[in-house]
């Protein structure tokens, strides 16, 4: 907000950053696509929300639109329009939480509930029986999603230096440090392979 109380318009630099963060969601998901329901999207959405606040919705919906452009429109896209919003809202509610374990539990719980949240679309389109059968058949994948989200958040989410920077209001620096940390964590183990 400006001194007059109005929101300032988004500049080109900020617009490009938000678009690139959305693209990063897709690229990191595709990089780990060979693992069933193990993806860093939830982790990055939590980081984006911690650093950017409500502006994290912009990269989230850039990601959703790119998913639709690549994979086509389907019922699963409909759930993406609200499921990621749920995660951003939860992250905003717990934004001041400092416990890495708390963030890991939030991320894991989101992964576990992902199928149930997505089943709402199938309830509207096919009724309770269809939604319930769809959700139950996906529980093994929700368990993998839960475990992956929990582990990634516990290990990678907001390392100590990043949390220190956030407290000092240096969000952009925190985001840059986080991505350097994430890239090192994901790429270094492969260097010896």
Functional labels for PLM-detected ranges:
Residues 1-51, 55-59, 87-95, 157, 161:
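Hydrophobic transmembrane alpha-helices
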Residues 5, 10-13, 93, 171, ...:
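Glycosyltransferase-associated regions of secretory-pathway enzymes
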Residues 19, 23, 47, 61-65, ...:
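Residue-level signature of the transmembrane alpha-helical core
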Residues 32, 42-45, 70, 122, ...:
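Hydrophobic side chains within alpha-helical segments
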Residues 59-62, 155-157:
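Short hydrophobic alpha-helical segments that form membrane-spanning helices or hydrophobic packing faces
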Residues 75-81, 97-193:
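Membrane-embedded alpha-helical hairpins and interfacial helices in multi-pass inner-membrane proteins
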């Amino acid at each position: 907000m400006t001194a007059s109380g109005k929101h300032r318009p988004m500049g080109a630099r900020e617009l490009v950053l938000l678009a690139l963060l959305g693209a990063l969601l897709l690229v990191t998901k595709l990089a780990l696509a060979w693992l069933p329901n193990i993806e860093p999207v939830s982790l990055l959405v939590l980081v984006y929300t911690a650093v950017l606040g409500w502006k994290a919705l912009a990269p989230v919906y850039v990601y959703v639109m790119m998913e639709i452009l690549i994979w086509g429109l389907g019922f699963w896209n409909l759930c993406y329009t609200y499921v990621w919003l749920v995660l951003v809202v939860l992250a905003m509610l717990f934004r001041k939480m400092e416990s890495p374990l708390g963030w890991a539990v939030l991320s894991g719980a989101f992964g576990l509930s992902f199928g149930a949240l997505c089943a709402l679309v199938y309830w509207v389109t096919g009724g309770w029986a269809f939604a319930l059968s769809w959700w139950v058949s996906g529980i093994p994948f929700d368990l993998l999603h839960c475990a992956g989200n929990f582990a990634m958040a516990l290990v990678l989410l907001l390392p100590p230096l990043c949390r220190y920077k956030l407290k000092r209001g240096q969000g952009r620096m925190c985001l840059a440090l986080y991505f350097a940390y994430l890239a090192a964590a994901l790429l270094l183990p492969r260097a010896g392979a």
